[in-house]
């Protein structure tokens, strides 16, 4: 008779969890940041609020965002005028859109990742779905499983209302699932649309206006598994993962789901809270590896906004090129909440390959993925890059 220890050993993978494919997608509707204030104040019938519009214009100008993608078109907003008021009861209509569109966008990202992975979808053993939009039962994880035609026995985990740090959370969970279940292939999907947060401007709540200037829609999917087969192409190894709460940060970033949708609350000192905590997180993550030079690792940082990136850069003495991939994604897509860091991973491995660098991590061996959001919660994931084999010229 076998022992429990023998069963456990047989259940566990040998090697570390590895990212095997990444897929990203956005809605078709693209908004230009430079003209967005005119559009936003027109569509919300707020053009008479000239001082507030000037403030919003400055927010958009300073955002370092060029464009964003949004499911909410002008047509949809005209059909739902309650979305355009600041605090009008509108949750039912918002939910009706979100519960359909969140899984649909997630499906497109998942199909892209599965295509790159190149394996039959029947090999997917686990699904982790993350969104801040549209709670339902059964959830978006179930809808995705049905839309993709995954096996009924696939093991699902649904994460609602996590916020901007959760791109790190899903990787941490996928790591544990892949390493503790031999042969597991975990599909993780972050799908975020601003249908629950879009609202008109208010003179009394400028933090809400900050969200209107920064947030965009997008979905990203990643396949994670340990002990890759010869047919699979590893991109990054997930070496360690940690989550912590920043001290004295209660109320720094909050969201509340109410009849009016999801309201967003932000304190002015968020950039300093993040930058003051980041070094301790990095030290705890990299001390076991003997790494203390933050310019010697590649960076995947959640781009909450330009002020946060500037303060992190300054606090750690990072060279400007360290946050290139992060700033590129912020510029091209805005802040897509949990999906952002997965978009940045995708951008980094593609840019590294296109530039002829030696690894998926800008030619470097070790890297950090850093996410933060409501709590203030911080996720720190240590990544190990994979050598890029030169392709045929």
From Swiss-Prot:
SUPFAM superfamilies: Thiolase-like (SSF53901)
Superkingdom per UniProt: Eukaryota
E.C. designation(s): 2.3.1.74
Active site: 164
Biochemical pathway: Secondary metabolite biosynthesis; flavonoid biosynthesis
Enzyme class: transferase
Pfam families: Chal_sti_synt_C (PF02797), Chal_sti_synt_N (PF00195)
MF GO annotations: naringenin-chalcone synthase activity
Matches recorded under InterPro entries: Chalcone/stilbene_synt_C (IPR012328), Chalcone/stilbene_synt_N (IPR001099), Chalcone/stilbene_synthase_AS (IPR018088), Polyketide_synthase_type-III (IPR011141), Thiolase-like (IPR016039)
Database matches in CDD domains: CHS_like
Catalytic reaction equation(s): (E)-4-coumaroyl-CoA + 3 malonyl-CoA + 3 H(+) = 2',4,4',6'-tetrahydroxychalcone + 3 CO2 + 4 CoA
Protein's job: The primary product of this enzyme is 4,2',4',6'-tetrahydroxychalcone (also termed naringenin-chalcone or chalcone) which can under specific conditions spontaneously isomerize into naringenin.
Family: Belongs to the thiolase-like superfamily. Chalcone/stilbene synthases family.
Database matches in PANTHER family: CHALCONE SYNTHASE 1 (PTHR11877:SF80), HYDROXYMETHYLGLUTARYL-COA SYNTHASE (PTHR11877)
The name this protein goes by in its record: Chalcone synthase LF1
Source organism of the structure: Ipomoea batatas
């Amino acid at each position: 008779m076998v022992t429990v220890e023998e069963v456990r050993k047989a259940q566990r993978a040998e090697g570390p969890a590895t990212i095997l494919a990444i897929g990203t997608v956005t809605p078709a509707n693209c908004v230009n940041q430079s003209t967005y204030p005119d559009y936003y104040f027109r569509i919300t019938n707020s053009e008479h609020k000239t001082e507030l519009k000037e403030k919003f214009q400055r927010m958009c100008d300073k955002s370092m965002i060029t464009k964003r993608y949004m499911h909410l078109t002008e047509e949809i907003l005209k059909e739902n005028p309650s979305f355009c008021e600041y605090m009008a009861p509108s949750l039912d209509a918002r939910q009706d859109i979100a519960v359909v569109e969140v899984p649909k966008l997630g499906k497109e990202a998942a199909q892209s990742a599965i295509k790159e992975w190149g394996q039959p979808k029947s090999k997917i053993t686990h699904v982790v779905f993350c969104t801040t939009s549209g709670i339902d039962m059964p959830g978006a994880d179930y809808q995705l499983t049905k839309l993709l035609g995954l096996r009924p026995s696939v093991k699902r985990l649904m994460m609602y209302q996590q916020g901007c740090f959760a791109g790190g959370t899903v990787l941490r969970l996928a790591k544990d699932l892949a390493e503790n279940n031999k042969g597991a292939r975990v599909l993780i999907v972050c799908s975020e649309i601003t249908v629950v947060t879009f609202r008109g401007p208010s003179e009394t709540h400028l933090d809400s206006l900050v969200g209107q200037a920064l947030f965009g829609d997008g979905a990203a999917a990643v396949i994670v598994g340990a002990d890759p087969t010869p047919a699979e192409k590893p991109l990054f190894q997930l070496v360690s993962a940690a989550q912590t709460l920043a001290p004295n940060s209660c109320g720094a970033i909050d969201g509340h789901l109410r009849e009016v949708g999801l309201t967003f609350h932000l304190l002015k000192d968020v950039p300093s809270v993040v930058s003051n905590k980041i070094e301790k997180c990095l030290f705890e993550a990299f001390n076991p590896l003997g790494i203390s030079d933050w310019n010697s690792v590649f960076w995947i940082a959640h781009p909450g906004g330009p002020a946060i990136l500037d303060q992190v850069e300054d606090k750690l003495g990072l060279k400007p090129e360290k946050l290139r991939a992060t700033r590129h994604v912020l510029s091209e897509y805005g802040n897509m909440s949990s999906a952002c860091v997965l978009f940045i991973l995708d951008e980094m491995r593609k840019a590294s390959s296109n530039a002829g660098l030696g690894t998926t991590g800008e030619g470097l061996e070790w890297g950090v993925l850093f996410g933060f959001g409501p709590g203030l919660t911080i996720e720190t994931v240590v990544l190990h890059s994979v050598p890029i084999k030169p392709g045929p010229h």
